Amino acid sequence: MTTTLASRPDGEGSVQVKLDPKVNIEEGALVIAVYGKGGIGKSTTSSNLSAAFSKLGKKVLQIGCDPKHDSTFTLTHKMVPTVIDILEEVDFHSEELRPEDFMFKGFNGVQCVESGGPPAGTGCGGYVTGQTVKLLKEHHLLEDTDVVIFDVLGDVVCGGFAAPLQHANYCLIVTANDFDSIFAMNRIVAAINAKAKNYKVRLGGVIANRSADLDQIEKFNERTGLKTMAHFRNVDAIRRSRLKKCTIFEMDPEEEGVKEVQNEYLSLAKKMIDNVEPLEVEPLKDREIFDLLGFD
C-alpha cells in the first residue's frame, strides 16, 4: 500500500508560519541572518561585522539566537542576560520591562540582545527569536536602526531556527575550506531556497573563515552559483580578540594581521550597504558534494 502525503505550504506546522505581520522589522533596515556550521566562527564574524557597520556610521543591532547566549560578549565585554530569562522574571508580562533590561550597548554604540532559548529538550528556539523581535517592536527599538544582524545557532535548519529568515533581507553563510563546513553550507542553502519562496530573504554570499585557501569553496561556488564575499585567513589576532573579549577593531592595528582583518570587515560591510545582488543558488545533492569536493 502506498501512502501519498498531501503537499503543505512552506513551514506549515512550525512556529514561523502565520507570524503577526506587526512583528515584521521596518522596511529600510538592512537585515542580515548569519548561518554556518557549528563552531565555524559565526559569533566572531557577526560581532566584527556589526562593529564594522558601526564604524561606517550605521546604527546597528545584533541579536544572538543561540541558547548559549555568547553571541555579543566581544561587543559588550561580558555575558548579558537573555530575553527569555528577563521575561521569566516578570512572568512574561513584557509591558513591565524597560529597554535597558534586555538591550545592552556594546562597542561603538552597537546595541546587543541575546534571545536565549528554552531549557534543553523543551520548547522552540525559533519561538524565542520571534518573541525577541516582538519585544523590540513593542518598545520602538527598531525604528531608528540601520542594520540588524541575527547570529543564528549552528547549522540547524529546522522550522524554529529558520525563524530569522522571515525577517532577513540577506543570508550570509560562514564556512571554512573543508568538506564538513561546505556540506553544512549546502544544507543551509537548501533551507534558504525553501524559505525564499514565501519570504523576502535572499542569499548574499559566503564568508570564508579560518581558511588559508579557497579552492574547495570556489569549486562549490562555481557549481551552485554562490559567491565569496569576504575571506578571513587563520589569523591569530582574531583568536586573541576573543580571548580579550573584544572585537577586532579594539585590537592594536600595529599587531600582525589586525589591520588586514579590519579592512576586510569594513569592505564586507560596504558591499552589504551597497545593496548586494541576490544570488540564484542551486544546492547539490549529498552524493554530488562527495563527488565534487576533495583532491583527485
From Swiss-Prot:
One Pfam family it belongs to: Fer4_NifH
Positions bound to ATP: G39, I40, G41, K42, S43, T44, K68, N209, R210
Binding site for [4Fe-4S] cluster: C124, C158
Keywords from the named record: 4Fe-4S, ATP-binding, Chlorophyll biosynthesis, Iron, Iron-sulfur, Magnesium, Metal-binding, Nucleotide-binding, Oxidoreductase, Photosynthesis
Cofactor note: Binds 1 [4Fe-4S] cluster per dimer.
Cofactor: [4Fe-4S] cluster
GO-annotated molecular function: 4 iron, 4 sulfur cluster binding; ATP binding; metal ion binding; oxidoreductase activity, acting on iron-sulfur proteins as donors; oxidoreductase activity, acting on the CH-CH group of donors, iron-sulfur protein as acceptor
Keyword 4Fe-4S: yes
GO biological process: light-independent chlorophyll biosynthetic process; photosynthesis, dark reaction
Chain positions recorded as Mg(2+) binding sites: S43
EC class name: oxidoreductase
EC number: 1.3.7.7
Record's catalysed reaction(s): chlorophyllide a + oxidized 2[4Fe-4S]-[ferredoxin] + 2 ADP + 2 phosphate = protochlorophyllide a + reduced 2[4Fe-4S]-[ferredoxin] + 2 ATP + 2 H2O
Iron among keywords: yes
Pathway assignment: Porphyrin-containing compound metabolism; chlorophyll biosynthesis (light-independent)
Family indicated by similarity: Belongs to the NifH/BchL/ChlL family.
Quaternary context: Homodimer. Protochlorophyllide reductase is composed of three subunits; ChlL, ChlN and ChlB.
Physiological role: Component of the dark-operative protochlorophyllide reductase (DPOR) that uses Mg-ATP and reduced ferredoxin to reduce ring D of protochlorophyllide (Pchlide) to form chlorophyllide a (Chlide). This reaction is light-independent. The L component serves as a unique electron donor to the NB-component of the complex, and binds Mg-ATP.
Entry protein name: Light-independent protochlorophyllide reductase iron-sulfur ATP-binding protein
